[in-house]
Regions:
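An acidic-aromatic loop/edge-strand motif
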Residues: 1-15, 38, 52-62, 67-142, ...
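Hydrophobic core positions of the immunoglobulin-like beta-sandwich fold
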Residues: 70, 186-187
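Aromatic-lined ligand-binding clefts that engage carbohydrates, nucleic acids, or primary amines
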Residues: 22-46, 80, 143-170, 197-201
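Solvent-exposed beta-strand/loop surfaces of large extracellular or lumenal domains
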Residues: 44-67, 167-184
Length: 253
């Protein structure tokens, strides 16, 4: 882990290089980026080619700067080398590869960039190719319904594992679900016949930023030491679920 490298690098007096491996099954399109902090302090090469220094904006936070990886990744193993000059104040932070793709893993240790699924199970999107995802995912489902005369109905979420669910029914915003009871009134937007519900699920930054390697998994309190607790370290990445166990339309007579 990077935190174990930081102290030796700070004590070092010359140049240093760190090598990272990225496994790719399907090269992402159209755009893919490498994200790093303080890029001006380093030089980066990808598969032996110098990474262009053109700034492509920020991601998540203004300190997270994007550099284009277009044309540099290939199927199989890719090598990213981060080089710099050691000094007592240097910081080493995680690197991120971002784009429109899915991530496959068998053991939560090794990960492979692959195609993004278009059909998923909502119970846990972490296991559907989105282990490090942070943001909003839109899930859509159509169904047939014979609407009762009262028109009263609600959408109820079972086992919610999200921060916010923004619910849309036939193109109309029915409201946001953020706490118990995890339900929203949708009757006024339903029609006889085919209905389409879209749920925009929002999660936190936990699966993206961690801590990923604490043996206790999800911690009740997180501080700087939570990311470098050697006594409770595990090489297996620890994620929290993202999704919901089920969603039911309940018609009230």
């Amino acid at each position: 882990p990077l935190w174990k490298v930081l102290d030796p690098v700070r004590r070092h007096s010359g140049r240093f290089s760190l090598q990272f491996s990225v496994s790719v099954e399907i090269v992402p399109e159209p755009d893919v980026f490498l994200v790093l902090e303080t890029p001006e302090a380093f030089s980066v090469s990808v598969n032996g080619t110098e990474l262009p220094e053109t700034d492509c904006g920020f991601w998540v936070d203004t300190s997270f700067r994007k550099r284009s990886l277009n044309g540099l990744l290939r199927t199989g193993e890719n090598t990213i080398v981060l080089s710099g000059t050691a000094n007592p104040k240097i910081e080493l932070e995680s690197l991120y590869v971002i784009g429109d793709f899915g991530v496959r893993t068998e053991d939560n240790r090794a990960f492979v960039i692959t195609s993004r699924k278009s059909v998923v199970l909502a119970q846990n999107l972490v296991e559907e190719g989105f282990p490090f995802f942070a943001g909003t995912i839109s899930l859509t489902q159509s169904f047939e319904m014979n609407l009762s005369a009262s028109g009263q109905a609600k959408l109820v979420f079972d086992d919610p594992q999200f921060v916010v669910a923004d619910v849309w029914v036939n193109g109309n915003n029915a409201g946001q679900v953020v706490w118990s009871p995890y339900e929203v009134e949708i009757g006024r937007f339903l029609v006889d016949g085919t209905n389409t519900i879209r749920v925009d699920l929002v999660n936190s930054l936990r699966n993206l930023l961690g801590p990923h390697h604490h043996a206790f998994g999800e911690l009740l309190g997180v501080g700087p030491d939570s990311f470098s607790d050697a006594e409770n370290w595990t090489d297996v990445y620890q994620f929290v679920p993202f999704g919901f166990g089920g969603a039911r339309v309940i018609v009230e007579s």
